[in-house]
């Protein structure tokens, strides 16, 4: 029975890089915000810098704007970490003849995203590899109606050989052909 069902866990937004950026943006945003407020009130709110000498109209306002923007972005990233957006699993079930793609979304009526496809509706397993400034290495579930459902999580791309091995192993398990997109 165990050789008929395969489940792959998908890590969502709870990755080290998101914790790092949320922390950095929070601290940096608060520092910029305090510097802008210090320039307006002429009270030094930062112990390591004298921000009372900043002119409020061009510099203080800009620092407050950037600080507010950075603070807001860090709150957004923290919310995605708290809700664990993008996590889930892919389940390949030969017993029920189904493939399930389950992901967590933002709170609301569509919090749990569930995509279910019968195995006879799947044409192949596809691999898309693009290099450059934003490299992408993605395994797709290619359906007969020409839709392509991504199966790999959004993260640092794996090596090409690892991705090809994963895709070949999945195609062999599901008895499907492998294609390059």
From Swiss-Prot:
Membrane topology: Multi-pass membrane protein
Compartmental location: Plastid, Chloroplast thylakoid membrane
Primary localization: plastid
Domain of life according to the entry: Eukaryota
Membrane spanning stretches: 19-39, 61-81
Keyword Cytoplasm among record annotations: no
GO terms of biological process kind: photosynthesis
Keyword annotations of the record: Chloroplast, Membrane, Photosynthesis, Plastid, Thylakoid, Transmembrane, Transmembrane helix
GO cellular component: chloroplast thylakoid membrane; photosystem I
Pfam families: Ycf4
Annotated InterPro entries: PSI_Ycf4_assembly
Coiled-coil zones: none
Family: Belongs to the Ycf4 family.
NCBIfam families xrefs: PRK02542.1
Protein role: Seems to be required for the assembly of the photosystem I complex.
Protein name: Photosystem I assembly protein Ycf4
Gene that this sequence comes from: ycf4
